[in-house]
UniProtKB/Swiss-Prot annotation:
Principal subcellular localization: plastid
Highest taxon above the source species: Eukaryota
Transmembrane segment boundaries: 20-40
Family annotation (InterPro entries): PSII_PsbL, PSII_PsbL_sf
GO cellular component: chloroplast thylakoid membrane; photosystem II reaction center
Record-given protein name: Photosystem II reaction center protein L
Pfam families on file: PsbL
Keywords carried by this UniProt record: Chloroplast, Membrane, Photosynthesis, Photosystem II, Plastid, Reaction center, Thylakoid, Transmembrane, Transmembrane helix
Keyword hit for Transmembrane: yes
Subunit text: PSII is composed of 1 copy each of membrane proteins PsbA, PsbB, PsbC, PsbD, PsbE, PsbF, PsbH, PsbI, PsbJ, PsbK, PsbL, PsbM, PsbT, PsbX, PsbY, PsbZ, Psb30/Ycf12, at least 3 peripheral proteins of the oxygen-evolving complex and a large number of cofactors. It forms dimeric complexes.
Amino acid sequence: MKPPNPTNPNDQNVELNRTSLYWGLLLIFVLAVPFSNYFFN
């Protein structure tokens, strides 16, 4: 992963979006585990 280029602020936005996307997927996964256990029991 290359460091963000200070002359290009768009790079920093891309990094932020990618990080928030990963956190969102992690949150969905953590929430899906107990729900799947509840539905499949």
